[in-house]
Amino acid sequence: AVVSVAGAVDGAGVAGQIDRLLVDETNVIVADFKTGARPSVTPADYHRQMALYAALLEQIYPDREVVTWLVWTEDRSVEEIDRAARDAALAALAPG
């Protein structure tokens, strides 16, 4: 089921719909489904989306590792957006 999330990241309001969310004792796994095949270069908007979801969930689950996946439906591939990519996406949002 889709999970709605809302909160603030670096003082900015954020709201979204997570396609699938799995929480266990050590991890929080976020999966977002994208139609089509995996592109050769993932759009920056998708990195930002997953970075913002992860930042919100890290506030809720500070003791768990947040893992973010893009699931491409056409070719059934999964792409993990790792912490470094998420951090870079958040840094690109910072003013100045």
Task: For each feature predicted by the language model, list its residue ranges.
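Structural signature of nuclease core domains in nucleic-acid processing machines
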Residues: 1-96
